[in-house]
From Swiss-Prot:
Family annotation (InterPro entries): Alpha-defensin (IPR016327), Alpha-defensin_C (IPR006081), Alpha-defensin_N (IPR002366), Beta/alpha-defensin_C (IPR006080)
Organism: Mus musculus (Mouse)
Classification lineage: Eukaryota, Metazoa, Chordata, Craniata, Vertebrata
PROSITE patterns reported for this sequence: DEFENSIN (PS00269)
A biological-process GO annotation: defense response to Gram-positive bacterium
Intrachain disulfide bonds: 64-92, 66-81, 71-91
SMART domains found in the cross-reference section: Defensin_propep, DEFSN
Protein name: Alpha-defensin 2
Renumbered residue ranges of the record's region Disordered: 23-49
UniProt record similarity statement: Belongs to the alpha-defensin family.
Tissue: Paneth cells of the small bowel.
Amino acid sequence: MKPLVLLSALVLLSFQVQADPIQNTDEETKTEEQSGEEDQAVSVSFGDREGASLQEESLRDLVCYCRTRGCKRRERMNGTCRKGHLMYTLCCR
């Protein structure tokens, strides 16, 4: 049952990341122009108070990053994420 819940949460997360447009502010535009930044942290939350049963320990420990290159060791590719017009690989561990 846990793998099914985890898989469902990851699918919903990837849909949410692709569906939510990110508005560019001046600060975000400056960040995009800096080519030195490779990795960006992503905040992941599953459900709300009604869906609190989904927040099992395995889901709360999930950490995801948007990476310009491939995933690092012990990370799995879980889709893509977008910031403005740039596409990144969504890597979770």
